[in-house]
């Protein structure tokens, strides 16, 4: 086995080394730039795809619409049958689906909840 490897090594040493610089010729500068931009865009697309699938947040439950009499209220899944009295305190008198933007004063900062 060692004699065979010595023969192969000798043949490889006798063959002249290949020169990588003697190709068909260098590409034009505009072609190099075009290839560089295309490779960059492919890498960015791969990064966006990985980010989209890897960093996906869990989706929130969709709203259900429950009709009570003449009015439809949006209810989150799992809160059926529970009434929130928070909305009653700032519901508008002008329209049933509008809310008042009540102001709260915190020290010198004037803020509104919406």
Curated annotation (Swiss-Prot):
Stored Pfam families: MAP17
Q: Which UniProt keywords apply?
A: Cell membrane, Membrane, Phosphoprotein, Transmembrane, Transmembrane helix
What ranges are annotated Cytoplasmic (topological domains)?
52-114
List all membrane-crossing ranges.
Answer: 29-51
Subcellular location(s) of the protein: Apical cell membrane
Is the Cell inner membrane keyword given for this protein?
A: no
A GO cellular component annotation in the UniProt record: apical plasma membrane
Q: Which domain of life is it from?
A: Eukaryota
Role summary: Auxiliary protein of electrogenic Na(+)-coupled sugar symporter SLC5A2/SGLT2 and SLC5A1/SGLT1. Essential for the transporter activity of SLC5A2/SGLT2 but not SLC5A1/SGLT1.
Which protein is depicted? PDZK1-interacting protein 1
Q: Which organism is it from?
A: Sus scrofa (Pig)
Q: What is the lineage of its organism?
A: Eukaryota, Metazoa, Chordata, Craniata, Vertebrata
Gene that produces this protein: PDZK1IP1
